[in-house]
Amino acid sequence: MGDDLFKEARKERDDFEELMNACDLAKMSVKNNEMVHGLETFGVNHGESSSENKPTEIMKVVAPTVEAYVGSSSSTTVTKPSGGAVDGIDQKEVRQDGTSVQKDDNGFIFYKCRFCGLTFNFMNTLRAHERIHDVSQPYVCGKCGESYEFACQLEYHAAQHSEIDGFKCDCGRTFFSYTEMLYHKHTDDPIELIGAPETTTVLVNKKKIIPVTEQDLPQPAFVTEGYEPKHPLRVYSDVRSKPYICEYCSKSYSDSRGLAYHMYSHRGEKQFNPRASRYMMGREGVGYTDSRSYYLFPRTSGYVSPRF
Protein backbone atom coordinates (compact mmCIF):
# COMPACT_ATOMS: atom_id res chain seq x y z
CA MET A 1 0.00 0.00 0.00
CA GLY A 2 2.80 2.37 0.86
CA ASP A 3 4.64 1.68 -2.40
CA ASP A 4 1.52 2.44 -4.43
CA LEU A 5 1.06 5.80 -2.70
CA PHE A 6 4.71 6.63 -3.25
CA LYS A 7 4.50 5.78 -6.96
CA GLU A 8 1.29 7.78 -7.39
CA ALA A 9 2.81 10.83 -5.67
CA ARG A 10 5.93 10.58 -7.78
CA LYS A 11 3.86 10.34 -10.96
CA GLU A 12 1.89 13.46 -10.00
CA ARG A 13 5.15 15.30 -9.34
CA ASP A 14 6.55 14.28 -12.72
CA ASP A 15 3.36 15.41 -14.45
CA PHE A 16 3.55 18.76 -12.67
CA GLU A 17 7.19 19.27 -13.66
CA GLU A 18 6.35 18.41 -17.26
CA LEU A 19 3.51 20.95 -17.22
CA MET A 20 5.79 23.67 -15.80
CA ASN A 21 8.43 22.94 -18.43
CA ALA A 22 5.81 23.32 -21.15
CA CYS A 23 4.73 26.68 -19.65
CA ASP A 24 8.33 27.90 -19.57
CA LEU A 25 8.77 26.82 -23.17
CA ALA A 26 5.69 28.77 -24.24
CA LYS A 27 6.87 31.89 -22.42
CA MET A 28 10.31 31.74 -24.00
CA SER A 29 8.92 31.22 -27.48
CA VAL A 30 6.56 34.21 -27.15
CA LYS A 31 9.26 36.37 -25.58
CA ASN A 32 11.93 35.70 -28.16
CA ASN A 33 9.45 35.69 -31.05
CA GLU A 34 10.96 32.50 -32.43
CA MET A 35 9.46 29.16 -33.36
CA VAL A 36 10.37 25.94 -31.69
CA HIS A 37 12.66 24.21 -34.15
CA GLY A 38 11.82 20.64 -33.33
CA LEU A 39 12.11 17.73 -31.05
CA GLU A 40 15.24 15.73 -30.39
CA THR A 41 15.08 12.12 -29.36
CA PHE A 42 17.67 10.07 -27.60
CA GLY A 43 17.88 6.67 -25.89
CA VAL A 44 19.02 5.82 -22.36
CA ASN A 45 20.90 2.52 -21.94
CA HIS A 46 20.66 0.56 -18.72
CA GLY A 47 22.92 -2.38 -19.65
CA GLU A 48 20.87 -3.16 -22.77
CA SER A 49 21.05 -2.19 -26.42
CA SER A 50 19.62 1.15 -27.48
CA SER A 51 17.20 -0.47 -29.91
CA GLU A 52 15.39 -2.30 -27.11
CA ASN A 53 14.80 0.83 -25.04
CA LYS A 54 11.97 3.18 -25.90
CA PRO A 55 13.28 6.61 -26.89
CA THR A 56 12.32 9.63 -24.75
CA GLU A 57 11.24 12.86 -26.40
CA ILE A 58 12.40 16.25 -25.08
CA MET A 59 11.88 19.79 -26.35
CA LYS A 60 14.73 22.03 -27.36
CA VAL A 61 14.62 25.80 -27.82
CA VAL A 62 17.20 27.71 -29.81
CA ALA A 63 18.82 30.51 -27.78
CA PRO A 64 18.03 34.05 -28.93
CA THR A 65 20.60 35.79 -31.06
CA VAL A 66 22.46 38.80 -29.71
CA GLU A 67 22.05 41.92 -31.80
CA ALA A 68 23.34 45.37 -31.00
CA TYR A 69 20.94 48.23 -31.35
CA VAL A 70 21.01 51.97 -31.08
CA GLY A 71 18.16 53.81 -29.39
CA SER A 72 16.32 56.73 -30.90
CA SER A 73 17.98 60.11 -30.54
CA SER A 74 14.71 61.89 -29.80
CA SER A 75 13.90 62.57 -26.17
CA THR A 76 11.34 60.65 -24.14
CA THR A 77 11.01 57.86 -26.72
CA VAL A 78 11.21 54.15 -26.07
CA THR A 79 12.65 51.87 -28.75
CA LYS A 80 12.75 48.08 -28.83
CA PRO A 81 15.03 45.91 -30.98
CA SER A 82 13.55 43.64 -33.61
CA GLY A 83 15.10 40.44 -32.32
CA GLY A 84 16.92 39.94 -29.04
CA ALA A 85 18.63 42.56 -26.89
CA VAL A 86 22.06 43.18 -25.50
CA ASP A 87 22.43 41.57 -22.06
CA GLY A 88 18.68 41.16 -21.71
CA ILE A 89 17.92 44.90 -22.01
CA ASP A 90 14.78 45.39 -24.06
CA GLN A 91 13.82 49.06 -23.46
CA LYS A 92 15.68 52.33 -23.74
CA GLU A 93 14.62 55.87 -22.92
CA VAL A 94 16.43 59.16 -23.37
CA ARG A 95 15.34 61.95 -21.05
CA GLN A 96 15.41 65.68 -21.67
CA ASP A 97 18.73 66.11 -19.86
CA GLY A 98 20.36 63.47 -22.08
CA THR A 99 20.40 60.68 -19.50
CA SER A 100 19.90 57.24 -21.04
CA VAL A 101 17.58 54.99 -19.01
CA GLN A 102 17.54 51.28 -19.87
CA LYS A 103 15.22 48.58 -18.54
CA ASP A 104 15.82 44.84 -18.78
CA ASP A 105 13.42 41.90 -18.90
CA ASN A 106 13.25 41.53 -15.12
CA GLY A 107 12.19 45.15 -14.61
CA PHE A 108 15.55 46.46 -13.35
CA ILE A 109 16.38 50.02 -14.44
CA PHE A 110 19.90 51.10 -15.38
CA TYR A 111 21.12 54.68 -15.83
CA LYS A 112 23.85 55.14 -18.42
CA CYS A 113 26.54 57.81 -18.20
CA ARG A 114 26.46 60.28 -21.09
CA PHE A 115 30.23 60.66 -21.21
CA CYS A 116 31.79 57.22 -20.70
CA GLY A 117 28.86 54.80 -21.07
CA LEU A 118 29.00 53.19 -17.61
CA THR A 119 25.66 52.06 -16.17
CA PHE A 120 24.46 52.46 -12.59
CA ASN A 121 21.47 51.22 -10.64
CA PHE A 122 20.52 54.58 -9.09
CA MET A 123 20.26 58.11 -10.45
CA ASN A 124 22.11 59.58 -7.45
CA THR A 125 25.05 57.26 -8.09
CA LEU A 126 25.14 58.35 -11.72
CA ARG A 127 25.11 62.05 -10.74
CA ALA A 128 27.97 61.46 -8.33
CA HIS A 129 29.91 59.61 -11.04
CA GLU A 130 29.43 62.36 -13.63
CA ARG A 131 31.33 64.80 -11.40
CA ILE A 132 34.59 63.00 -12.15
CA HIS A 133 34.36 64.10 -15.79
CA ASP A 134 34.81 67.73 -14.65
CA VAL A 135 32.04 69.13 -16.84
CA SER A 136 31.04 72.65 -15.79
CA GLN A 137 27.48 72.44 -17.13
CA PRO A 138 26.51 68.77 -17.48
CA TYR A 139 22.73 69.28 -17.55
CA VAL A 140 21.64 69.95 -21.13
CA CYS A 141 18.10 70.70 -22.29
CA GLY A 142 16.89 68.19 -24.86
CA LYS A 143 14.81 70.75 -26.78
CA CYS A 144 16.89 73.91 -27.09
CA GLY A 145 20.38 72.66 -26.18
CA GLU A 146 21.05 75.07 -23.30
CA SER A 147 23.26 73.66 -20.54
CA TYR A 148 23.13 74.31 -16.81
CA GLU A 149 25.27 73.59 -13.80
CA PHE A 150 22.56 72.18 -11.52
CA ALA A 151 19.58 69.92 -12.15
CA CYS A 152 17.18 72.36 -10.48
CA GLN A 153 18.12 75.00 -13.06
CA LEU A 154 17.32 72.58 -15.86
CA GLU A 155 13.97 71.69 -14.27
CA TYR A 156 13.05 75.36 -14.02
CA HIS A 157 14.15 75.92 -17.62
CA ALA A 158 12.15 72.90 -18.84
CA ALA A 159 8.98 74.53 -17.50
CA GLN A 160 9.38 77.26 -20.14
CA HIS A 161 8.85 74.66 -22.88
CA SER A 162 5.61 73.47 -21.29
CA GLU A 163 2.19 75.11 -21.48
CA ILE A 164 2.25 76.40 -17.90
CA ASP A 165 1.14 80.03 -17.59
CA GLY A 166 3.64 82.20 -15.73
CA PHE A 167 4.09 85.82 -14.65
CA LYS A 168 5.41 88.13 -17.36
CA CYS A 169 7.37 91.28 -16.51
CA ASP A 170 7.44 94.50 -18.51
CA CYS A 171 11.01 93.69 -19.52
CA GLY A 172 9.79 90.63 -21.45
CA ARG A 173 10.97 87.86 -19.13
CA THR A 174 8.52 85.24 -17.91
CA PHE A 175 8.70 83.76 -14.42
CA PHE A 176 6.81 80.83 -12.97
CA SER A 177 6.85 82.26 -9.45
CA TYR A 178 5.41 85.63 -8.47
CA THR A 179 8.19 86.18 -5.93
CA GLU A 180 10.92 85.71 -8.55
CA MET A 181 9.14 88.09 -10.89
CA LEU A 182 8.87 90.68 -8.11
CA TYR A 183 12.51 90.54 -7.01
CA HIS A 184 14.36 89.96 -10.27
CA LYS A 185 16.91 92.55 -11.37
CA HIS A 186 17.00 94.91 -14.32
CA THR A 187 20.19 96.28 -15.75
CA ASP A 188 18.93 99.87 -15.70
CA ASP A 189 17.46 99.79 -12.18
CA PRO A 190 19.33 101.48 -9.32
CA ILE A 191 20.54 99.24 -6.54
CA GLU A 192 18.26 100.70 -3.87
CA LEU A 193 15.10 99.98 -5.91
CA ILE A 194 15.81 96.29 -6.59
CA GLY A 195 13.13 94.23 -4.88
CA ALA A 196 11.40 97.30 -3.39
CA PRO A 197 7.61 97.15 -3.57
CA GLU A 198 5.59 99.96 -5.03
CA THR A 199 4.80 102.81 -2.66
CA THR A 200 1.17 103.15 -1.72
CA THR A 201 -0.63 105.93 0.12
CA VAL A 202 -2.51 104.87 3.23
CA LEU A 203 -5.02 107.27 4.79
CA VAL A 204 -4.79 107.26 8.56
CA ASN A 205 -7.41 108.83 10.80
CA LYS A 206 -5.28 111.16 12.91
CA LYS A 207 -7.48 111.30 15.99
CA LYS A 208 -6.06 112.81 19.13
CA ILE A 209 -5.28 110.05 21.61
CA ILE A 210 -5.73 111.00 25.26
CA PRO A 211 -3.16 109.28 27.48
CA VAL A 212 -4.54 107.21 30.35
CA THR A 213 -2.92 107.72 33.73
CA GLU A 214 -2.76 105.32 36.63
CA GLN A 215 -5.29 107.37 38.62
CA ASP A 216 -7.93 106.88 35.91
CA LEU A 217 -7.82 103.08 36.16
CA PRO A 218 -10.38 101.44 38.50
CA GLN A 219 -9.01 99.94 41.68
CA PRO A 220 -10.36 96.73 43.25
CA ALA A 221 -12.07 96.88 46.60
CA PHE A 222 -9.47 94.83 48.47
CA VAL A 223 -6.85 97.49 47.72
CA THR A 224 -8.73 100.20 49.58
CA GLU A 225 -10.82 98.23 52.11
CA GLY A 226 -8.63 95.18 52.64
CA TYR A 227 -9.56 91.62 53.64
CA GLU A 228 -10.65 90.37 57.02
CA PRO A 229 -8.95 87.04 57.57
CA LYS A 230 -11.32 84.10 57.88
CA HIS A 231 -8.85 82.28 60.13
CA PRO A 232 -6.99 83.72 63.12
CA LEU A 233 -3.39 84.70 62.62
CA ARG A 234 -0.92 81.90 63.12
CA VAL A 235 1.71 81.89 65.78
CA TYR A 236 5.36 81.24 65.02
CA SER A 237 5.11 77.49 65.60
CA ASP A 238 2.25 77.17 63.10
CA VAL A 239 4.07 79.30 60.56
CA ARG A 240 7.12 77.10 60.88
CA SER A 241 5.13 73.92 60.17
CA LYS A 242 3.01 75.57 57.45
CA PRO A 243 5.09 78.37 55.94
CA TYR A 244 2.96 78.87 52.81
CA ILE A 245 0.30 81.43 53.82
CA CYS A 246 -2.41 82.91 51.62
CA GLU A 247 -2.08 86.68 51.39
CA TYR A 248 -5.85 87.16 51.16
CA CYS A 249 -7.36 84.88 53.83
CA SER A 250 -4.25 83.97 55.90
CA LYS A 251 -4.81 80.25 55.40
CA SER A 252 -1.51 78.36 55.57
CA TYR A 253 -0.27 75.19 53.92
CA SER A 254 2.71 72.94 54.39
CA ASP A 255 3.70 72.87 50.70
CA SER A 256 3.47 75.23 47.75
CA ARG A 257 1.24 72.87 45.79
CA GLY A 258 -1.53 73.10 48.35
CA LEU A 259 -1.32 76.88 48.29
CA ALA A 260 -1.45 76.85 44.49
CA TYR A 261 -4.67 74.82 44.53
CA HIS A 262 -6.08 77.13 47.17
CA MET A 263 -5.50 80.20 44.99
CA TYR A 264 -8.12 78.91 42.55
CA SER A 265 -10.82 79.83 45.05
CA HIS A 266 -9.80 83.50 45.00
CA ARG A 267 -9.70 83.65 41.20
CA GLY A 268 -13.29 82.56 40.75
CA GLU A 269 -12.15 79.35 39.03
CA LYS A 270 -12.97 75.77 39.90
CA GLN A 271 -10.77 72.94 38.76
CA PHE A 272 -12.58 70.02 37.17
CA ASN A 273 -12.29 66.79 39.10
CA PRO A 274 -13.54 63.71 37.22
CA ARG A 275 -13.83 61.77 40.51
CA ALA A 276 -16.51 64.19 41.74
CA SER A 277 -18.77 63.37 38.76
CA ARG A 278 -21.02 60.33 39.05
CA TYR A 279 -21.29 60.18 35.27
CA MET A 280 -17.54 60.11 34.72
CA MET A 281 -16.99 57.60 37.50
CA GLY A 282 -19.73 55.36 36.10
CA ARG A 283 -18.04 55.09 32.72
CA GLU A 284 -15.66 52.19 32.20
CA GLY A 285 -12.60 52.05 30.03
CA VAL A 286 -11.80 55.78 30.07
CA GLY A 287 -8.91 55.53 32.52
CA TYR A 288 -10.35 57.55 35.42
CA THR A 289 -10.68 54.48 37.65
CA ASP A 290 -7.50 52.88 36.38
CA SER A 291 -4.81 52.33 39.00
CA ARG A 292 -2.08 53.51 36.62
CA SER A 293 -3.68 56.92 36.03
CA TYR A 294 -5.23 57.36 39.47
CA TYR A 295 -2.58 59.71 40.83
CA LEU A 296 -2.74 61.97 37.78
CA PHE A 297 -5.80 63.68 39.29
CA PRO A 298 -5.54 65.71 42.53
CA ARG A 299 -7.38 64.74 45.68
CA THR A 300 -9.68 67.73 46.03
CA SER A 301 -12.96 68.07 47.91
CA GLY A 302 -14.59 65.63 45.47
CA TYR A 303 -12.19 62.82 46.39
CA VAL A 304 -13.56 59.34 45.79
CA SER A 305 -11.77 56.21 46.96
CA PRO A 306 -10.36 54.17 44.07
CA ARG A 307 -12.05 50.98 42.92
CA PHE A 308 -9.24 48.50 42.25
From Swiss-Prot:
GO function term, MF aspect, one: cytoskeletal protein binding
Keywords: Cytoplasm, Developmental protein, Differentiation, DNA-binding, Metal-binding, Muscle protein, Myogenesis, Nucleus, Repeat, Thick filament, Transcription, Transcription regulation, Zinc, Zinc-finger
Protein name per UniProt: Zinc finger protein unc-98
PROSITE patterns to which the protein is assigned, alphabetical: ZINC_FINGER_C2H2_1, ZINC_FINGER_C2H2_2
Cell inner membrane among keywords: no
Task of the protein: Probable transcription factor. Required for muscle structure. Its dual subcellular localization suggests that it may function both as a muscle adhesion complex protein and as a transcription factor, or work together with transcription factors, to influence gene expression. Thought to act as a molecular bridge between unc-97 and mhc-a at the M-line of muscles, possibly in a signaling role.
Entry-linked SMART domains: ZnF_C2H2 (SM00355)
Zinc fingers (C2H2-type) by residue: 111-133, 139-161, 166-186, 244-266
GO-annotated cellular components: M band; myosin filament; nucleus
One GO term (biological process): post-embryonic body morphogenesis
UniProt superkingdom: Eukaryota
Note on domains (UniProt): The N-terminal part (1-106) mediates the nuclear localization, while the fourth zinc finger is required for the localization to M-lines and dense bodies.
Entry's localization field: Nucleus; Cytoplasm
